[in-house]
Amino acid sequence: MTRYEMAQIVAKAMAKGANVDKLAAEFADELDSLGVRVANLEKKADNVKITGQIRASYKDVSGDKKDNNMRLRSRLFVNGTINDDWTYTGRFHNEQYVNGNDGKGSAGEDDLDFNWAFVSGRVGGVKMDAGRMDFTYADVVDVRGDGVKLAYGDDVKVTGWVFKGNSDIEMLSDDRVYVAGVETSFGAVDTTVRYYRADTEFDNEIVEVALAGEIAKDLTLRGTWFNGTTDDKAETLAGTDVDTNGWLVGLSYGGAKASEPGSWGVYANYSDRPFATYLLPTNLSGYADAPYALLNESSVAGAAKADGYEGYEIGANVTLAKNIVAAVKYFDLEEREGSKDAQTLWSEVVFTF
């Protein structure tokens, strides 16, 4: 095409453009009104987003605590934009047990629960989440509750939580928990210090000091020290002094990313955790009466006498295809002051859509 032919096309377009301008001027009010309605419609269409997750898992426990079940968890997440600074998140959750039971003596289909409902935004420079959500610092507590999370800062981040547990798990149900923490980095080492105060029957107070850093590409070493105190009731139940200091060390390589097929990771942890140094860590949260059901202790007194647990956990995960991640874990834990032990093999495939 010559430049002259191109100029002819441009001239025709300009002529049509002039006609469009005239029509736009004539129907300015109507177009204005229509434009507002269309813009608002488009904005509202993007205002709510629904995503989902299917989690199929199998757990087999041997040793003094024997149990097995196959569980299917279905979740729908509702995310809505309130304004430029605030959002809303809700979650519908259903559990089905193909075999075994849920640890509370029931099996089969569970009800559909609406178990997340919280808003997120900023008040000045403080980030806030408020409502019903999960409260998880994996080595000390992992429970759903009603409350508030606050965070301030970047290089040095100060955090604060206050919540009341509301899950089916007996531990922390209706107990108020307060958490304050500081997170920062010293060179390549990430450092976290947290203080926990829980209004449980033992009036738990826990201090957690955690360090983590890469020692080689994608290879991370972490270590944590815990100090926990309880009121006299725990020692009365145990019939002896309860230990107050615990520790954990872990090594991990890589990690599966749902958006990257073929990505994978492995890890290993070893821990020595007296009864006073945790509330409900993630590795115990799958048990309805955790922590004492883990080792088949039928009462809080039994758990106090056992004085917590020690042992190791190893695991691996891989992204099989985009948004499909498989994971497997093995725990071997025993009572610190008792004779009971439990071995748990746990596997899961997560589909995200």
What kind of feature is each model-predicted range?
Residues 2-3, 17, 38, 57-69, ...:
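Outer-membrane beta-barrel pore domains
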Residues 3, 49, 53-59, 65-192, ...:
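Outer membrane beta-barrel
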Residues 1-55:
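N-terminal periplasmic/intermembrane-space "pro-region" immediately following the signal or transit peptide
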